[in-house]
C-alpha cells in the first residue's frame, strides 16, 4: 500500500510517498480503508522538529474511511461501518489499523 512517510525531520521535502507493508488489525483494532485525512498542527510540528522513532514513519493523526476488518475483541464496529479516527500516527496511508475505541 502507499503511505506518506519520513525518515528524518525537516521541511516538507522530507516526506516521501512510498510502498509500505499493509497494516494488520490487532484484537482491539479496526482496519480502515482511508478515504480522507486531516493535516493537524502536530503533524507539521513533529515532521519539522522531531526525529521519527522508526524508519519510514507514517505520518498523520486523523482520518475517515470505511472499516474493512475488525479485531477478534471488537464488538462496537463491523465491516462496512464508516468511521472517523484519531490516533498518534499512521493515518496518511491507504489503510490504517487503529484501536476501535479511537473511532
Q: Where do the PLM segments sit?
A:
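Cytochrome P450 core scaffold surrounding the K-helix E-X-X-R motif
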Residues: 42-48
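Short beta-strand or tight-loop elements
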Residues: 13-18, 63
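A structural motif shared across PLP-dependent enzymes of the aminotransferase-like
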Residues: 87-100
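Glycine/small-residue-rich loop that forms an oxyanion/phosphate-binding "nest" at active or ligand-binding sites
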Residues: 84, 102-103
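Short N-terminal binding/cap micro-motifs at the start of the first secondary-structure element
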Residues: 10-15, 41-42, 75
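Glycine-rich beta-strand-centered segment in the early N-terminal region that forms part
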Residues: 21-38, 49-90
